[in-house]
From Swiss-Prot:
Family: Belongs to the Speedy/Ringo family.
InterPro entries to which the protein is assigned, alphabetical: Speedy
Cited PANTHER family: WBSCR19-LIKE PROTEIN
Protein name as annotated: Putative speedy protein E7
Pfam family, one: Spy1
Single GO MF descriptor: protein kinase binding
Organism the protein comes from: Homo sapiens (Human)
Amino acid sequence: MEWWDKSEESLEEEPRKVLAPEPEEIWVAEMLCGLKMKLKRRRVSLVLPEHHEAFNRLLEDPVIKRFLAWDKGLRVSDKYLLAMVIVYFSRAGLPSWQYQCIHFFLALYLANDMEEDDEDPKQNIFYFLYGKTRSRIPLLRKRRFQLCRCMNPRARKNRSQIVLFQKLRFQFFCSMSCRAWVSPEELEEIQAYDPEHWVWARDRARLS
């Protein structure tokens, strides 16, 4: 796919950068009662408006548009997983203009890796990007598929792209200081930035 070549080159050529700092914790006044003050510890978010802007820009990408429309069951792209993409953008530490289509899928894959116990959703990302992979072939057909794959240059190319995707996923994960967990409070904060955004209507619970 055309999206891969440009994104792959830009990500491979990125210079070594300082890892994004971890969010600090501050004490804020929650309640005043006479001379008494109740303090509550709150984590300072590192998500900036520019990270939301990068996310919104990528939503206009034709490949991402097709992917979101393709995921009708919201198995890999419900509102919480998409909110995690924005958080990951803030943690990776890249300038907002450098985020491209490949970064969206890397972040979304990591979000699924973190939140979903089922392996199928992550495989669906590969299925969309590269077509049917070995993991989605029934067991009795695997030997035949292995033979065809050896004879099919396109199948070998798809396999190598998946391997490269996993390599880039690990690099992206390291750029976030290996911090993939996102708290419920952070997810609420992301959605509260623009509560009317159409992606927050992608609620998997409403489909069940």
